[in-house]
Regions:
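TM-adjacent membrane-interface loops and short helices in multi-pass inner/ER membrane proteins
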Residues: 280-319, 326, 333-340
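Canonical positions in the second alpha-helix
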Residues: 495-496, 529-530, 560-564, 594
């Protein structure tokens, strides 16, 4: 049994089963569980052989915490069917992480080759599906009209850029070794494959890279500096000790420069009534959800509905994600899940950096360098595009991390034949668990009322979103018929105010519930309290402004609704809508407000 488990082909079979499981959840989710169970067979065989079921890594406990918060995120989600698929894609991502980290060094070349194939396949997919006519140019229009027609969904060019960068970096190991080999009679075929493949990947890279060219320049300069420092570390012990810290400092500088530039970019490509649509604006608005759902998270796949319903207050989807990998994780899985994922990424960079200056093998050092570059791209580019935690891309969430851990973990069995976790790994795990626990204990001890208020507000917000967003988007405003279904959420939110009367989350949502009941005086009181605490929250501004309209206080309403460009058109619709609801008085208020917002209509 141990001969089978120790064979390099067993590790590749493990990886193949995990890839099949992930593909099943993407293409045929009805049979996904069956494929996931099959993917666990290598774990069972390792256990029967006397080994641990999976390869131990320094971040195992954090991975476990991340998985637990993902399960909690499924419970909290308003769309259970979408959340069910996503939680299993996360499980597939974790299985991929352990399948990659367990690969022996002999398989590194084949894994790099798979990365090249993925980059090539993604490039072909992009060329066959993207609307090049929309970006102008004769060639783009010609290609869009004459290429083979495929009825596949297009992938955003920013997502393609990130995935190609990561996979191409990891593929470089195979490309480098392949160019030095002789293939005999197959040389011509292999050379054509390499040239055409690299040409296709390079073409797509050029087509998608224009907006971040200055960041790439800084990226290259920083890498050269780090490379020179790593050479010095061979003869200077102090340089070797501080090298991981230098890498993290470089990462911070790169993120700062990147966010000062591309953060102002417009992910929706057009400015409209709902704001600047910049990443900086999305980061600010998304941050409010971190305050609403700090403990459980808002639920898997919840950002689109939350942003539309509670931030811009419209009955249809606007953004599918926050264009920020780490923000999306923290929103959907809470502070604990978000912190766990961030620490995993930073720990991986630290550990790989250590291996670069400590590993004497040039071959393994090169693989570690490539892993480090892929991790840096994942983190920096993940601050601007979320393709690793959105849709089918979720299955690749731990792909760069798993490749990085290949050069970090120790796969040598002990004398008893059982793989044990190195002492250093245990110390890292203990520190990663102890510090957050101490922080939580300190938080509870300092202000228990604040914590209880956060808990009830979080729970009430989850209960409310599960009712209001059950069939979202409907394309229509909710009516008072929904109010009775929100009684449980209302009771929970009132409990939050008993511990902290200024809890913004509870006051905002209680105000929305009172508006549904058409109790506008109570709604105004709650919304005013919330507005005092967070005067820049767009959802609160809009809801309070509308509440003032229904109360007939047009002057106060105008002060707020002047900040909401779409209010003018929506008020015109409300003139008709309130009339159909049997409230001609509110229809008249909407008409008065329309005149204020659009003086030309008078």
């Amino acid at each position: 049994m141990r001969q089978l488990v120790d064979n390099r082909w067993f590790a590749l079979a493990d990886l193949l089963l995990v890839m099949m499981s992930a593909a099943a959840w993407m293409l045929i989710p009805l049979y996904g569980i069956g494929f996931s169970l099959i993917a666990l067979l290598p774990w069972i065989l390792r256990f029967l052989a006397g080994y641990l079921p999976f390869q131990r890594t320094p971040v195992d406990w954090l991975i476990a915490i991340f998985l637990v918060t993902a399960c909690v995120g499924y419970w909290a989600a308003y769309d259970k069917s979408a959340a069910w698929v996503k939680v299993w894609l996360i499980v597939s991502a974790v299985l991929l992480y352990y399948a990659l980290s367990a690969q022996p060094k002999q398989n590194l070349g084949f894994l790099s080759f798979l990365s090249f194939c993925f980059a090539l396949a993604l490039s072909l997919y992009f060329c066959l599906t993207y609307d090049f006519a929309g970006i102008g140019g004769r060639f783009g229009g010609w290609w869009t009209n004459h290429r083979p027609h495929v009825d596949w969904p297009a992938i955003h060019y920013g997502d393609v850029l990130g995935l190609i960068l990561i996979s191409a970096i990891l593929a470089f190991y195979w490309l480098w070794n392949t160019t030095k080999k002789a293939f005999g009679s197959a040389a011509v075929v292999m050379q054509l494959f390499l040239i055409s493949g690299m040409g296709m990947v390079a073409l797509v890279f050029v087509l998608t890279v224009s907006r971040v060219i200055e960041v790439i320049g800084l990226f290259a300069v920083g890498l050269w500096v780090l490379w020179r420092v790593s050479i010095l570390s061979a003869t200077h012990v102090r340089v070797r000790a501080v090298f991981p810290s230098l890498v993290l400092i470089y990462l911070v500088i790169l993120i700062t420069v990147a966010y000062l530039g591309p953060a102002s970019d417009d992910p929706a490509s057009t400015h409209n009534n709902y704001g600047r649509n910049s990443r900086a604006e999305l980061l600010e608005r998304g941050g409010y959800f971190l305050l609403d759902y700090p403990i459980t998270g808002a639920g898997l796949n919840s950002f689109p509905g939350l942003y539309s319903q509670y931030m811009i207050v419209i009955p249809f989807f606007y953004f599918s994600n926050s264009y920020n990998l780490f923000l999306d994780v923290a929103i959907e899985q809470g502070w604990i899940g978000g912190a766990a994922f961030l620490i995993i990424c930073l720990a991986a960079i630290w550990l790989v950096s250590q291996r670069i200056v400590k590993d004497p093998s040039n071959e393994i050092r090169m693989a570690n360098w490539l892993s480090l570059l892929a991790l840096i791209v994942m983190i920096v580019h993940g601050l601007f595009y979320d393709y690793l935690y959105n849709g089918n891309g979720t299955a690749l969430l731990f792909f760069p991390l798993g490749m990085a851990m290949m050069g970090v973990v120790n796969r040598n069995p002990t004398e008893n034949g059982v793989i044990k976790s190195p002492k250093a790994f245990s110390q890292v795990n203990m520190a990663m668990i102890t510090l957050p626990v101490l922080a939580l204990i300190l938080t509870f001890g300092v202000n228990i009322n604040k914590v209880m208020s956060l808990w009830y507000a979080n729970l009430g917000a989850v209960q409310m979103s599960q009712v209001e967003l059950e069939n979202f988007p409907t394309g229509q405003w909710a009516t008072s018929e929904m109010a009775p279904r929100l009684e449980v959420a209302q009771s929970t939110l009132h409990a939050a105010l008993q511990y902290d009367s200024h809890n913004q989350t509870a006051n905002y949502r209680l105000g929305l519930i009172s508006m549904l009941r058409q109790d506008f005086k109570t709604a105004a009181a709650n919304l005013e309290t919330a507005y005092q605490d967070v005067p820049n929250h767009r959802g609160i501004i809009k809801s309070l402004g509308y509440c003032y309209v229904w109360l007939g206080d047009i002057d106060k309403a105008q002060t707020l609704l002047d900040q909401i460009p779409e209010a003018q058109n929506e008020m015109k619709v409300y003139i008709w809508w309130w009339d159909t609801q049997g409230r001609p008085d509110l229809s008249e208020n909407a008409s008065r407000m329309t005149s204020r917002l659009d003086p030309s209509s008078q």
